[in-house]
A protein has these predicted regions:
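Ligand/cofactor pocket segment of small-molecule handling proteins
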Residues: 193
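N-terminal FAD-binding dinucleotide-binding subdomain shared by FAD-dependent oxidases/monooxygenases
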Residues: 2-11, 16-21, 25-156, 171-172, ...
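A conserved hydrophobic secondary-structure block that centers on an alpha-helix together
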Residues: 169, 173-175, 180-183
Length: 533
Protein backbone atom coordinates (compact mmCIF):
# COMPACT_ATOMS: atom_id res chain seq x y z
CA UNK A 1 0.00 0.00 0.00
CA UNK A 2 3.02 2.31 0.17
CA UNK A 3 3.14 5.29 -2.16
CA UNK A 4 6.94 5.13 -2.25
CA UNK A 5 8.03 1.96 -4.08
CA UNK A 6 11.75 2.61 -3.57
CA UNK A 7 11.87 0.95 -0.16
CA UNK A 8 11.41 -2.56 1.20
CA UNK A 9 8.90 -1.71 3.93
CA UNK A 10 6.02 0.64 4.46
CA UNK A 11 6.98 1.05 8.11
CA UNK A 12 9.69 -0.02 10.51
CA UNK A 13 8.72 0.02 14.18
CA UNK A 14 11.31 0.16 16.96
CA UNK A 15 10.23 -1.37 20.28
CA UNK A 16 7.94 -4.27 21.22
CA UNK A 17 6.13 -2.91 24.24
CA UNK A 18 2.49 -1.81 24.32
CA UNK A 19 3.11 0.81 21.61
CA UNK A 20 5.00 -1.38 19.18
CA UNK A 21 2.67 -4.36 19.43
CA UNK A 22 -0.46 -2.31 18.87
CA UNK A 23 1.20 -0.45 15.98
CA UNK A 24 2.20 -3.71 14.33
CA UNK A 25 -1.32 -5.11 14.64
CA UNK A 26 -2.95 -1.89 13.47
CA UNK A 27 -0.74 -1.21 10.45
CA UNK A 28 -0.70 -4.82 9.34
CA UNK A 29 -4.49 -4.71 9.40
CA UNK A 30 -4.33 -1.83 6.92
CA UNK A 31 -2.40 -4.02 4.50
CA UNK A 32 0.97 -2.40 5.13
CA UNK A 33 4.30 -4.21 4.98
CA UNK A 34 5.60 -3.66 8.51
CA UNK A 35 8.50 -5.00 10.53
CA UNK A 36 9.46 -4.45 14.16
CA UNK A 37 12.91 -4.47 15.76
CA UNK A 38 13.28 -5.19 19.48
CA UNK A 39 16.53 -5.17 21.48
CA UNK A 40 15.28 -7.65 24.09
CA UNK A 41 14.89 -11.37 23.54
CA UNK A 42 11.13 -11.21 24.00
CA UNK A 43 8.28 -8.75 23.66
CA UNK A 44 7.19 -6.63 26.62
CA UNK A 45 9.20 -3.42 26.48
CA UNK A 46 9.44 -1.88 29.94
CA UNK A 47 7.83 -4.99 31.37
CA UNK A 48 10.50 -7.21 29.85
CA UNK A 49 13.42 -5.37 31.42
CA UNK A 50 12.00 -4.32 34.81
CA UNK A 51 11.79 -7.71 36.54
CA UNK A 52 12.85 -6.67 40.03
CA UNK A 53 10.92 -8.03 43.04
CA UNK A 54 7.80 -5.98 43.68
CA UNK A 55 7.64 -4.44 40.19
CA UNK A 56 4.04 -3.69 39.34
CA UNK A 57 1.88 -1.13 37.57
CA UNK A 58 0.36 1.85 39.37
CA UNK A 59 -2.74 1.78 37.13
CA UNK A 60 -5.43 -0.85 37.75
CA UNK A 61 -5.13 -3.95 35.58
CA UNK A 62 -8.55 -3.66 33.97
CA UNK A 63 -7.54 -0.22 32.69
CA UNK A 64 -3.90 -0.98 31.92
CA UNK A 65 -4.80 -3.15 28.97
CA UNK A 66 -5.70 -2.95 25.30
CA UNK A 67 -9.19 -1.97 24.21
CA UNK A 68 -8.81 -2.61 20.47
CA UNK A 69 -10.18 -6.17 20.54
CA UNK A 70 -13.19 -7.08 22.64
CA UNK A 71 -12.47 -10.81 22.57
CA UNK A 72 -9.04 -10.10 24.03
CA UNK A 73 -10.37 -7.99 26.89
CA UNK A 74 -13.13 -10.49 27.62
CA UNK A 75 -10.95 -13.61 27.61
CA UNK A 76 -7.98 -12.32 29.59
CA UNK A 77 -8.31 -12.76 33.35
CA UNK A 78 -6.27 -10.44 35.52
CA UNK A 79 -5.24 -11.84 38.88
CA UNK A 80 -4.75 -8.66 40.90
CA UNK A 81 -6.12 -5.14 41.14
CA UNK A 82 -2.65 -3.78 40.32
CA UNK A 83 -0.82 -6.23 38.06
CA UNK A 84 2.71 -7.34 38.86
CA UNK A 85 5.45 -7.44 36.22
CA UNK A 86 5.18 -11.19 35.51
CA UNK A 87 1.45 -10.86 34.81
CA UNK A 88 1.84 -7.86 32.48
CA UNK A 89 4.71 -9.60 30.68
CA UNK A 90 2.56 -12.71 30.27
CA UNK A 91 -0.29 -10.56 28.92
CA UNK A 92 1.93 -8.95 26.28
CA UNK A 93 3.31 -12.35 25.29
CA UNK A 94 -0.28 -13.52 24.90
CA UNK A 95 -1.11 -10.52 22.71
CA UNK A 96 1.91 -11.22 20.48
CA UNK A 97 0.93 -14.88 20.13
CA UNK A 98 -2.82 -14.42 19.83
CA UNK A 99 -2.47 -12.00 16.91
CA UNK A 100 0.51 -13.80 15.34
CA UNK A 101 2.69 -10.72 15.68
CA UNK A 102 5.99 -12.52 16.19
CA UNK A 103 6.39 -13.37 12.51
CA UNK A 104 7.07 -9.69 11.85
CA UNK A 105 9.33 -9.09 14.88
CA UNK A 106 13.11 -9.40 15.04
CA UNK A 107 14.13 -9.94 18.67
CA UNK A 108 17.61 -9.36 20.14
CA UNK A 109 18.07 -6.77 17.40
CA UNK A 110 19.08 -3.30 18.51
CA UNK A 111 18.58 -0.38 16.15
CA UNK A 112 21.85 1.54 16.09
CA UNK A 113 21.14 4.26 13.54
CA UNK A 114 18.70 5.54 10.93
CA UNK A 115 19.36 7.94 8.07
CA UNK A 116 16.88 9.80 5.88
CA UNK A 117 17.60 10.00 2.13
CA UNK A 118 16.18 13.21 0.68
CA UNK A 119 16.45 11.97 -2.92
CA UNK A 120 14.52 8.73 -2.47
CA UNK A 121 12.43 10.02 0.46
CA UNK A 122 13.17 6.87 2.42
CA UNK A 123 14.72 5.90 5.73
CA UNK A 124 17.51 3.36 5.99
CA UNK A 125 17.50 1.66 9.37
CA UNK A 126 20.61 -0.12 10.63
CA UNK A 127 19.86 -2.78 13.22
CA UNK A 128 22.85 -4.92 14.19
CA UNK A 129 23.71 -5.51 10.55
CA UNK A 130 22.75 -4.46 7.04
CA UNK A 131 20.34 -1.60 6.57
CA UNK A 132 16.69 -1.97 5.59
CA UNK A 133 14.72 0.75 3.82
CA UNK A 134 11.33 2.02 4.83
CA UNK A 135 8.94 4.83 4.04
CA UNK A 136 8.02 5.44 7.69
CA UNK A 137 10.15 5.05 10.80
CA UNK A 138 8.04 4.84 13.94
CA UNK A 139 9.71 5.01 17.33
CA UNK A 140 7.87 3.01 19.99
CA UNK A 141 10.91 3.00 22.25
CA UNK A 142 9.12 3.89 25.47
CA UNK A 143 9.41 6.71 27.97
CA UNK A 144 11.13 4.71 30.71
CA UNK A 145 13.40 2.31 28.88
CA UNK A 146 16.99 3.52 29.44
CA UNK A 147 18.24 2.88 33.00
CA UNK A 148 20.23 5.66 34.63
CA UNK A 149 23.32 4.58 36.54
CA UNK A 150 24.46 7.35 38.88
CA UNK A 151 28.00 8.68 38.78
CA UNK A 152 29.00 7.74 42.33
CA UNK A 153 32.71 7.65 43.15
CA UNK A 154 33.92 4.10 43.73
CA UNK A 155 30.86 2.37 42.27
CA UNK A 156 33.00 0.20 40.02
CA UNK A 157 35.13 -0.86 43.00
CA UNK A 158 32.34 -2.49 45.00
CA UNK A 159 33.35 -6.09 45.71
CA UNK A 160 29.82 -7.46 45.90
CA UNK A 161 27.12 -7.82 43.27
CA UNK A 162 25.40 -4.74 41.81
CA UNK A 163 21.99 -4.76 40.13
CA UNK A 164 19.87 -2.07 38.48
CA UNK A 165 16.09 -2.31 38.75
CA UNK A 166 15.79 -1.32 35.09
CA UNK A 167 17.95 -4.23 33.91
CA UNK A 168 17.21 -7.00 36.37
CA UNK A 169 18.56 -10.52 35.70
CA UNK A 170 16.04 -13.01 34.34
CA UNK A 171 17.08 -15.65 36.83
CA UNK A 172 16.28 -13.34 39.73
CA UNK A 173 18.37 -12.55 42.80
CA UNK A 174 18.40 -14.44 46.10
CA UNK A 175 18.74 -11.99 48.99
CA UNK A 176 18.40 -14.62 51.71
CA UNK A 177 20.91 -14.09 54.48
CA UNK A 178 22.49 -11.17 52.63
CA UNK A 179 23.24 -7.64 53.72
CA UNK A 180 21.64 -5.49 51.02
CA UNK A 181 21.69 -1.79 50.21
CA UNK A 182 19.25 0.06 47.98
CA UNK A 183 20.05 3.46 46.49
CA UNK A 184 16.96 5.29 45.27
CA UNK A 185 13.50 5.78 46.74
CA UNK A 186 11.40 6.64 43.71
CA UNK A 187 8.79 4.28 42.30
CA UNK A 188 11.19 1.38 41.67
CA UNK A 189 12.85 1.64 45.06
CA UNK A 190 9.55 1.96 46.88
CA UNK A 191 8.37 -1.28 45.26
CA UNK A 192 11.66 -3.14 45.73
CA UNK A 193 12.44 -2.21 49.33
CA UNK A 194 9.56 -4.05 51.10
CA UNK A 195 10.30 -7.23 49.13
CA UNK A 196 14.02 -7.21 49.93
CA UNK A 197 13.34 -6.50 53.60
CA UNK A 198 11.29 -9.71 53.88
CA UNK A 199 14.25 -11.97 53.09
CA UNK A 200 17.50 -10.05 53.61
CA UNK A 201 19.51 -10.36 56.79
CA UNK A 202 19.70 -6.58 56.82
CA UNK A 203 18.61 -3.82 54.44
CA UNK A 204 20.21 -0.38 54.30
CA UNK A 205 18.25 2.22 52.35
CA UNK A 206 20.34 5.15 51.12
CA UNK A 207 17.83 7.95 50.54
CA UNK A 208 18.67 11.29 48.97
CA UNK A 209 15.13 12.55 48.31
CA UNK A 210 12.04 11.34 50.15
CA UNK A 211 9.04 10.52 47.96
CA UNK A 212 5.33 11.01 48.33
CA UNK A 213 3.59 7.65 48.18
CA UNK A 214 0.02 6.46 48.61
CA UNK A 215 -1.16 2.93 49.41
CA UNK A 216 -2.22 0.72 46.52
CA UNK A 217 -4.55 -1.39 48.67
CA UNK A 218 -3.78 -4.14 46.21
CA UNK A 219 -5.31 -7.60 46.33
CA UNK A 220 -6.83 -10.35 44.21
CA UNK A 221 -9.22 -9.02 41.59
CA UNK A 222 -12.78 -9.44 42.85
CA UNK A 223 -14.67 -11.79 40.45
CA UNK A 224 -17.87 -9.75 40.70
CA UNK A 225 -15.99 -6.53 39.93
CA UNK A 226 -14.35 -8.24 36.96
CA UNK A 227 -17.73 -9.39 35.61
CA UNK A 228 -19.13 -5.88 35.99
CA UNK A 229 -16.15 -4.34 34.19
CA UNK A 230 -16.33 -6.79 31.31
CA UNK A 231 -20.06 -6.29 30.92
CA UNK A 232 -19.54 -2.54 30.60
CA UNK A 233 -16.09 -2.30 29.02
CA UNK A 234 -17.11 0.02 26.14
CA UNK A 235 -18.46 2.61 28.57
CA UNK A 236 -15.47 2.24 30.90
CA UNK A 237 -13.08 2.80 28.00
CA UNK A 238 -15.11 5.79 26.83
CA UNK A 239 -14.91 7.36 30.28
CA UNK A 240 -11.15 6.77 30.36
CA UNK A 241 -10.70 8.60 27.05
CA UNK A 242 -12.92 11.39 28.42
CA UNK A 243 -10.70 11.79 31.49
CA UNK A 244 -7.74 14.14 31.72
CA UNK A 245 -5.62 11.33 33.18
CA UNK A 246 -6.68 8.66 30.69
CA UNK A 247 -8.32 6.71 33.50
CA UNK A 248 -11.39 7.58 35.53
CA UNK A 249 -10.51 8.88 39.00
CA UNK A 250 -13.81 10.49 39.92
CA UNK A 251 -12.24 13.95 39.71
CA UNK A 252 -13.80 16.63 41.90
CA UNK A 253 -14.24 20.01 40.19
CA UNK A 254 -14.11 21.97 43.46
CA UNK A 255 -11.08 23.94 44.62
CA UNK A 256 -9.36 22.68 47.77
CA UNK A 257 -9.31 26.02 49.59
CA UNK A 258 -12.99 26.65 48.87
CA UNK A 259 -13.84 23.74 51.16
CA UNK A 260 -13.77 23.82 55.00
CA UNK A 261 -10.86 21.94 56.57
CA UNK A 262 -13.04 19.20 58.07
CA UNK A 263 -14.76 18.52 54.74
CA UNK A 264 -11.44 18.52 52.94
CA UNK A 265 -9.99 15.91 55.29
CA UNK A 266 -13.12 13.81 54.86
CA UNK A 267 -12.66 13.94 51.08
CA UNK A 268 -9.00 12.96 51.40
CA UNK A 269 -9.87 10.14 53.81
CA UNK A 270 -12.41 8.70 51.39
CA UNK A 271 -9.94 8.70 48.53
CA UNK A 272 -7.08 7.39 50.67
CA UNK A 273 -9.33 4.47 51.53
CA UNK A 274 -9.79 3.68 47.84
CA UNK A 275 -6.05 3.47 47.24
CA UNK A 276 -3.98 4.45 44.23
CA UNK A 277 -4.26 7.71 42.34
CA UNK A 278 -7.79 8.50 43.58
CA UNK A 279 -6.27 11.04 45.98
CA UNK A 280 -5.01 13.20 43.09
CA UNK A 281 -8.58 13.72 41.90
CA UNK A 282 -9.78 15.15 45.21
CA UNK A 283 -9.74 18.78 44.01
CA UNK A 284 -9.15 20.30 40.60
CA UNK A 285 -6.53 22.81 41.74
CA UNK A 286 -4.15 20.49 43.61
CA UNK A 287 -1.56 20.75 40.83
CA UNK A 288 -2.25 24.40 40.06
CA UNK A 289 -1.25 26.32 43.19
CA UNK A 290 1.17 25.79 46.06
CA UNK A 291 -1.55 26.58 48.58
CA UNK A 292 -3.91 23.91 47.28
CA UNK A 293 -1.09 21.41 46.92
CA UNK A 294 -0.01 21.99 50.51
CA UNK A 295 -3.38 20.72 51.74
CA UNK A 296 -2.90 17.26 50.24
CA UNK A 297 0.87 17.18 50.82
CA UNK A 298 0.41 17.86 54.54
CA UNK A 299 -2.28 15.18 54.67
CA UNK A 300 0.14 12.59 53.25
CA UNK A 301 2.94 13.76 55.56
CA UNK A 302 0.66 13.16 58.55
CA UNK A 303 -0.08 9.66 57.25
CA UNK A 304 3.65 8.92 57.13
CA UNK A 305 4.11 10.13 60.71
CA UNK A 306 1.21 7.94 61.83
CA UNK A 307 2.67 4.87 60.13
CA UNK A 308 6.39 4.99 60.93
CA UNK A 309 7.00 4.23 64.60
CA UNK A 310 10.36 5.95 65.08
CA UNK A 311 9.84 9.74 64.96
CA UNK A 312 13.30 10.51 63.55
CA UNK A 313 12.90 7.94 60.78
CA UNK A 314 9.44 9.29 60.02
CA UNK A 315 10.77 12.83 59.65
CA UNK A 316 13.49 11.60 57.30
CA UNK A 317 10.81 9.94 55.16
CA UNK A 318 8.76 13.14 54.96
CA UNK A 319 9.05 14.69 51.46
CA UNK A 320 9.96 18.36 51.57
CA UNK A 321 10.90 21.09 49.16
CA UNK A 322 8.67 20.16 46.24
CA UNK A 323 4.93 19.82 45.59
CA UNK A 324 3.14 16.49 45.84
CA UNK A 325 2.72 15.08 42.34
CA UNK A 326 5.37 17.31 40.75
CA UNK A 327 7.51 14.20 40.90
CA UNK A 328 5.47 11.17 39.93
CA UNK A 329 3.60 10.10 43.04
CA UNK A 330 4.33 6.52 44.05
CA UNK A 331 1.81 3.78 44.78
CA UNK A 332 3.08 1.29 47.35
CA UNK A 333 2.38 -1.82 49.34
CA UNK A 334 3.63 -1.52 52.93
CA UNK A 335 6.51 0.78 52.03
CA UNK A 336 6.45 3.00 55.10
CA UNK A 337 5.57 0.02 57.32
CA UNK A 338 8.84 -1.59 56.21
CA UNK A 339 10.81 0.93 58.27
CA UNK A 340 9.26 -0.52 61.43
CA UNK A 341 11.18 -3.76 60.86
CA UNK A 342 14.27 -4.42 62.96
CA UNK A 343 16.38 -5.40 59.96
CA UNK A 344 15.94 -2.11 58.06
CA UNK A 345 18.10 1.01 58.41
CA UNK A 346 17.32 4.30 56.69
CA UNK A 347 20.28 6.54 55.88
CA UNK A 348 19.17 10.11 55.25
CA UNK A 349 21.66 11.48 52.73
CA UNK A 350 20.27 14.98 53.23
CA UNK A 351 21.88 14.91 56.67
CA UNK A 352 25.05 13.09 55.70
CA UNK A 353 25.73 12.95 51.93
CA UNK A 354 27.00 9.84 50.19
CA UNK A 355 30.71 10.32 49.57
CA UNK A 356 31.60 7.07 47.82
CA UNK A 357 30.98 3.40 47.33
CA UNK A 358 33.77 1.35 48.89
CA UNK A 359 34.79 -2.26 48.20
CA UNK A 360 32.86 -3.25 51.33
CA UNK A 361 29.88 -0.91 51.09
CA UNK A 362 29.32 2.84 51.29
CA UNK A 363 30.80 5.86 53.02
CA UNK A 364 28.78 8.92 54.01
CA UNK A 365 29.94 12.09 55.71
CA UNK A 366 29.74 10.55 59.17
CA UNK A 367 29.60 6.75 58.84
CA UNK A 368 30.46 3.63 56.85
CA UNK A 369 27.99 0.90 55.93
CA UNK A 370 28.86 -2.62 54.86
CA UNK A 371 26.76 -4.81 52.60
CA UNK A 372 27.03 -7.74 50.18
CA UNK A 373 24.61 -6.64 47.46
CA UNK A 374 23.90 -3.18 46.03
CA UNK A 375 20.65 -2.44 44.21
CA UNK A 376 20.42 0.73 42.13
CA UNK A 377 16.83 1.95 41.93
CA UNK A 378 18.02 5.14 40.28
CA UNK A 379 15.48 5.55 37.51
CA UNK A 380 15.74 6.29 33.82
CA UNK A 381 16.83 8.77 31.20
CA UNK A 382 13.16 9.45 30.66
CA UNK A 383 11.30 10.20 27.44
CA UNK A 384 14.31 11.06 25.27
CA UNK A 385 16.93 8.56 26.45
CA UNK A 386 16.15 5.78 23.98
CA UNK A 387 16.04 8.19 21.04
CA UNK A 388 19.33 9.82 22.08
CA UNK A 389 21.02 6.44 21.90
CA UNK A 390 20.08 5.90 18.26
CA UNK A 391 21.94 7.94 15.66
CA UNK A 392 18.94 9.40 13.81
CA UNK A 393 19.89 11.67 10.91
CA UNK A 394 17.32 13.77 9.06
CA UNK A 395 17.30 16.45 6.38
CA UNK A 396 20.62 18.17 5.69
CA UNK A 397 22.54 15.70 7.82
CA UNK A 398 21.21 17.07 11.10
CA UNK A 399 20.97 14.51 13.87
CA UNK A 400 18.05 14.35 16.25
CA UNK A 401 20.46 14.47 19.16
CA UNK A 402 21.91 17.73 17.87
CA UNK A 403 18.48 19.24 17.23
CA UNK A 404 17.47 18.35 20.78
CA UNK A 405 20.67 19.56 22.45
CA UNK A 406 18.70 22.29 24.25
CA UNK A 407 15.73 20.03 24.96
CA UNK A 408 13.25 17.97 22.92
CA UNK A 409 11.04 19.80 20.43
CA UNK A 410 8.11 18.16 18.65
CA UNK A 411 4.77 18.93 17.10
CA UNK A 412 2.10 17.23 19.21
CA UNK A 413 4.73 14.82 20.51
CA UNK A 414 4.28 12.96 17.22
CA UNK A 415 6.69 14.47 14.70
CA UNK A 416 9.88 16.51 14.45
CA UNK A 417 10.58 19.22 11.87
CA UNK A 418 13.44 18.21 9.59
CA UNK A 419 12.75 14.50 10.05
CA UNK A 420 10.16 13.51 7.42
CA UNK A 421 8.10 10.36 8.07
CA UNK A 422 9.60 9.95 11.54
CA UNK A 423 6.76 9.37 13.98
CA UNK A 424 7.03 9.20 17.76
CA UNK A 425 4.63 7.30 20.00
CA UNK A 426 4.06 8.92 23.41
CA UNK A 427 6.80 11.42 22.67
CA UNK A 428 7.80 14.57 24.52
CA UNK A 429 5.05 17.15 24.15
CA UNK A 430 2.22 14.64 24.62
CA UNK A 431 0.41 13.59 27.84
CA UNK A 432 2.12 10.16 27.92
CA UNK A 433 3.68 9.74 31.38
CA UNK A 434 1.11 12.03 33.04
CA UNK A 435 -1.67 9.66 32.03
CA UNK A 436 -2.58 6.00 31.85
CA UNK A 437 0.09 5.07 29.32
CA UNK A 438 -2.07 2.52 27.51
CA UNK A 439 -4.81 5.08 26.90
CA UNK A 440 -2.24 7.58 25.62
CA UNK A 441 -0.57 4.94 23.46
CA UNK A 442 -3.80 3.78 21.86
CA UNK A 443 -4.73 7.34 20.93
CA UNK A 444 -1.31 7.93 19.35
CA UNK A 445 -1.27 4.65 17.45
CA UNK A 446 -4.76 5.20 16.07
CA UNK A 447 -3.90 8.75 15.00
CA UNK A 448 -0.69 7.57 13.30
CA UNK A 449 -2.49 4.74 11.51
CA UNK A 450 -5.17 7.11 10.22
CA UNK A 451 -2.42 9.45 9.01
CA UNK A 452 -0.74 6.69 7.00
CA UNK A 453 -4.07 5.75 5.48
CA UNK A 454 -4.75 9.37 4.57
CA UNK A 455 -1.37 9.75 2.90
CA UNK A 456 -1.83 6.56 0.89
CA UNK A 457 -5.29 7.52 -0.33
CA UNK A 458 -4.17 11.06 -1.23
CA UNK A 459 -0.89 10.09 -2.90
CA UNK A 460 1.50 11.74 -0.44
CA UNK A 461 5.01 10.36 0.11
CA UNK A 462 6.19 12.40 3.09
CA UNK A 463 4.98 14.35 6.09
CA UNK A 464 6.84 16.45 8.64
CA UNK A 465 5.91 19.30 10.95
CA UNK A 466 6.40 22.85 9.74
CA UNK A 467 9.01 24.50 11.94
CA UNK A 468 6.52 27.23 12.84
CA UNK A 469 3.98 24.66 14.01
CA UNK A 470 6.60 22.86 16.06
CA UNK A 471 7.74 26.10 17.67
CA UNK A 472 4.15 27.00 18.48
CA UNK A 473 3.43 23.64 20.08
CA UNK A 474 6.60 23.75 22.19
CA UNK A 475 5.63 27.23 23.39
CA UNK A 476 2.14 25.97 24.24
CA UNK A 477 3.51 22.96 26.16
CA UNK A 478 5.79 25.26 28.16
CA UNK A 479 3.02 27.76 28.81
CA UNK A 480 0.66 25.08 30.10
CA UNK A 481 3.35 23.74 32.42
CA UNK A 482 3.95 27.25 33.79
CA UNK A 483 0.37 27.38 35.06
CA UNK A 484 1.05 24.39 37.33
CA UNK A 485 3.37 23.36 40.14
CA UNK A 486 5.05 20.66 38.02
CA UNK A 487 8.18 22.68 37.11
CA UNK A 488 8.88 23.33 40.80
CA UNK A 489 10.44 19.90 41.32
CA UNK A 490 13.77 18.60 40.06
CA UNK A 491 12.05 15.58 38.52
CA UNK A 492 12.65 13.17 35.67
CA UNK A 493 9.74 14.97 33.98
CA UNK A 494 12.24 17.84 33.75
CA UNK A 495 15.26 15.67 32.94
CA UNK A 496 16.78 16.79 36.24
CA UNK A 497 18.02 13.30 37.15
CA UNK A 498 20.44 13.19 34.20
CA UNK A 499 23.65 15.24 34.54
CA UNK A 500 23.92 17.73 31.69
CA UNK A 501 20.43 17.11 30.34
CA UNK A 502 18.52 20.33 29.54
CA UNK A 503 15.88 20.92 32.18
CA UNK A 504 12.55 21.57 30.53
CA UNK A 505 9.19 20.07 31.38
CA UNK A 506 8.75 17.36 28.74
CA UNK A 507 5.17 16.02 28.97
CA UNK A 508 2.00 17.94 28.08
CA UNK A 509 -0.01 18.89 31.17
CA UNK A 510 -3.18 19.91 29.33
CA UNK A 511 -4.60 16.43 29.75
CA UNK A 512 -5.72 13.66 27.43
CA UNK A 513 -9.06 15.20 26.50
CA UNK A 514 -7.77 18.56 25.27
CA UNK A 515 -4.79 16.89 23.66
CA UNK A 516 -6.88 14.41 21.69
CA UNK A 517 -9.21 17.23 20.65
CA UNK A 518 -6.21 19.14 19.26
CA UNK A 519 -4.91 16.07 17.41
CA UNK A 520 -8.32 15.47 15.87
CA UNK A 521 -8.61 19.11 14.79
CA UNK A 522 -5.23 18.88 13.07
CA UNK A 523 -6.31 15.75 11.20
CA UNK A 524 -9.70 17.17 10.23
CA UNK A 525 -7.98 20.18 8.66
CA UNK A 526 -5.87 17.99 6.39
CA UNK A 527 -3.08 17.69 8.98
CA UNK A 528 -2.63 21.38 9.56
CA UNK A 529 0.80 22.30 10.83
CA UNK A 530 2.35 19.47 8.84
CA UNK A 531 3.93 19.71 5.41
CA UNK A 532 2.78 16.90 3.10
CA UNK A 533 4.46 16.15 -0.20
Amino acid sequence: MRTNTRCSHDAIIVGAGFSGLYLLWKLRGQGLNVHLFEAGDDVGGTWFWNRYPGARCDVESVDYSFSFDDELQQEWKWKERYPAQPEIFEYLQHVADRFDLRRDISLTTRVRSARYDEDTRTWTVYADGAGVTTQFLIMATGCLSVPQTPNIPGLECFAGRTYHTGDWPKEGVDFSGKRVAVIGTGSSGIQLIPEVAKVAEHLTVLQRTASFSVPALNGPLDPEFEREVKANYPERRRRARASSAGVERGDNEQNALDVPYEDRVKEFDGRWGKGGFALLGAYQDLMLTDEANDTVADYVRDKIRATVEDPDTAESLIPRGYPLGAKRICVDTNYFETYNRGNVTLVDLRKSPLESITPAGARTGDAEYEFDVLCLATGFDAMTGALDRIDITGVGGETLKNKWQHGPTTYLGLGVAGFPNLLLIAGSGSPSVLANMVTAIEQHVEWAAELLGYMSSHGYDTIEPAQEAEDGWVAHVNEMASYTVFPKAASWYMGANIPGKPQIFMPYVGGCVEYEKKCNEVAEKGYSGFVLR
